[in-house]
Amino acid sequence: MSDTAETQEAQTQEAQTPQLSMQRVFLKDISFESPRSPMIFQEEWKPEVGLELNTKSRQVGENVYEVVLEITVTVKNNGNTGYLVQVQQGGLFVISGLDDQQLHHALGAFCPATLFPYARENIDAVVVKGSFPAIMLAPINFDALYIESLQKQQAETTQ
């Protein structure tokens, strides 16, 4: 085999090899509200935590995707809002060599799971600065959420 043919074959194999790497992590937006401060600090603290998750993704360059994990945490105490935190944790990911289904899964589950620890850290930091105890969100199974979302979409399209 000639050197040119070997080089072309190596380049073809390299182009088909799946690549997924995080290029950058960034905090896109963060908001903290504590509407009942400072009176809430005089109450017995029995928090009820509500959590909302959402993800967005878009292609921003050749094989480069922006993924944004949006988390809203609402903590109530005795039925009243103690605080509300909203975070948009972003990341740039280089992804190539995946078919459409694999790419959709990577953008909908793998990338958000990679961003979650950064978002959780930012949420804890702002909550503590608001003079509340750290919330330490439990790990989230983004693969299960992704599968659930797909099943829900399929059920809606069959109706």
From Swiss-Prot:
An example Gene Ontology biological process: protein tetramerization
Superkingdom: Bacteria
- What are the GO MF terms of this UniProt record? unfolded protein binding
Where in or outside the cell? Cytoplasm
The Gene Ontology CC terms held by the record are:
cytoplasm
List keywords of the entry alphabetically.
Chaperone, Cytoplasm, Protein transport, Translocation, Transport
Please give the positions of the paired cysteines in each disulfide bond: none
User: Where is this protein primarily located?
Assistant: cytoplasm
Q: Does the keyword Transport apply?
A: yes
One short Pfam name that applies is SecB
Coiled-coil regions in this chain?
Answer: none
| Subunit composition and interactions | Homotetramer, a dimer of dimers. One homotetramer interacts with 1 SecA dimer.
Q: Which family does it belong to?
A: Belongs to the SecB family.
* Function (record text): One of the proteins required for the normal export of preproteins out of the cell cytoplasm. It is a molecular chaperone that binds to a subset of precursor proteins, maintaining them in a translocation-competent state. It also specifically binds to its receptor SecA.
Q: What is this protein called?
A: Protein-export protein SecB
Protein encoded by which gene: secB
